[in-house]
């Protein structure tokens, strides 16, 4: 009898391909043995070790499967919202090709980061948030033309060669989609969980489903879904209009069995404060819009507490057993 245990990587293998290879091997070397393919589960053995970052308690990814839904604006204000709940917070701009954090955190014209005696970069800081971005290291108008491995290497340096100090939460603003940068973060970084940002319309929500399933496949917990640009309040009559549809993200979250963290309206001051590098959570902390972000941040804190206190969390992934 020929037996072997194979642990799968993050995605399920092609059973037909494995069966074909094994049958070929049997004919050549094990003609008198029987080969069987069984599904099973065992302890997680990832291909790439996820190494914790000293001093950082939680790392959360803010993601959107589709661009243009206001993810970076949400990431910035979520970071500031977490900080308003007396947490020490960092903000990492994972979008190497189109960094937004320098502008939104009013660090666009700041000098480049210094390094300490250990050759670690000192993160730039504003509004009490430690920030790191590729936008701090290159000229604003210079394009970054890199292939996947270079992106992964750059992200590792931004993340691990930065002197973050002590952080309760590091918020990572991911680029849209499910490309190299996101896979690097999921496979190499011990993410506590992911926050998905979407607008309410069907064309955005279809991508949300794919994004959520991607995080599930790489075993990153989903902290919840945020509905951005949820509605518009008329400044003259105060009537609410759901321009992109009503509660689309909330209903999607319910169908997928994930948490709905809250919604944020379309509002002129959110756009203006973001473009000027003076986020509304800081400049207008008592406004209804700032309260939306703070409430979402409070829900995220609750989810982080649940994950961190769950001693029975399932860390297993499927294996293939060949007997």
From Swiss-Prot:
Any GO molecular function: metal ion binding
UniProt xrefs under Pfam families: ParA
GO cellular component: mitochondrion
Cofactor(s) needed: [4Fe-4S] cluster
InterPro entries with a match to the protein in the record: Mrp/NBP35_ATP-bd, NUBPL-like, P-loop_NTPase, YlxH/NBP35
Residues given in the record as ATP binding sites: 65-72
Keywords for this protein: 4Fe-4S, ATP-binding, Iron, Iron-sulfur, Metal-binding, Mitochondrion, Nucleotide-binding, Transit peptide
Main location: mitochondrion
CDD domains per UniProt: Mrp_NBP35 (cd02037)
Textual note on the cofactor: Binds 1 [4Fe-4S] cluster.
Gene Ontology BP, a term: mitochondrial respiratory chain complex I assembly
Compartments where located: Mitochondrion
SUPFAM superfamilies for the chain: P-loop containing nucleoside triphosphate hydrolases
Function, as annotated: Iron-sulfur cluster transfer protein involved in the assembly of the mitochondrial membrane respiratory chain NADH dehydrogenase (Complex I). May deliver one or more Fe-S clusters to complex I subunits.
The family this protein is said to belong to: Belongs to the Mrp/NBP35 ATP-binding proteins family.
Protein name, UniProt field: Iron-sulfur cluster transfer protein NUBPL
Species this protein is from: Dictyostelium discoideum (Social amoeba)
Gene, per the UniProt record: nubpl
């Amino acid at each position: 009898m020929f037996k072997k245990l194979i642990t799968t990587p993050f995605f399920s293998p092609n059973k037909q391909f494995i069966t074909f290879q094994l049958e070929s091997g049997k004919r050549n070397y094990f003609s008198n043995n029987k080969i069987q393919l069984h599904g099973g589960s065992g302890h997680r053995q990832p291909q790439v070790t996820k190494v914790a970052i000293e001093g950082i308690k939680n790392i959360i990814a803010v993601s959107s499967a589709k661009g243009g839904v206001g993810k970076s604006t949400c990431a910035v204000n979520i970071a500031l919202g977490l900080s308003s709940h007396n947490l020490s917070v960092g903000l990492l701009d994972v979008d190497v090709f189109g960094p937004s954090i320098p502008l939104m955190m009013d660090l666009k014209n700041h000098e480049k980061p210094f390094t300490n005696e250990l050759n670690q970069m000192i993160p730039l800081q504003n509004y009490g948030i430690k920030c790191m971005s590729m936008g701090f290291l290159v000229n604003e108008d210079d394009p970054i033309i890199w292939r996947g491995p270079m992106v992964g290497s750059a992200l590792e340096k931004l993340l691990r060669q930065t002197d973050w100090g002590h952080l309760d939460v590091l918020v990572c603003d991911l680029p849209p989609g499910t490309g190299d940068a996101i896979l690097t973060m999921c496979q190499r970084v011990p993410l506590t969980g992911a926050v998905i940002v979407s607008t309410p319309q069907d064309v955005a929500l279809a991508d949300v489903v794919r994004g959520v399933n991607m995080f599930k496949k790489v075993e990153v917990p989903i902290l919840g879904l945020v509905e951005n640009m949820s509605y518009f309040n008329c400044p003259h009559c105060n009537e609410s209009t759901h321009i992109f549809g009503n509660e689309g993200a909330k209903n999607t979250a319910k169908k997928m069995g994930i948490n709905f963290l809250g919604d944020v309206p379309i509002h002129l001051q959110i756009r203006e404060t973001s473009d000027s590098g003076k986020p509304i959570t800081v400049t207008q902390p008592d406004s209804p819009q700032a309260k939306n972000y703070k409430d979402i941040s409070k829900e995220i804190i609750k989810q982080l507490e649940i994950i961190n206190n769950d001693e029975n969390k399932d860390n297993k992934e499927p294996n293939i057993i060949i007997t």
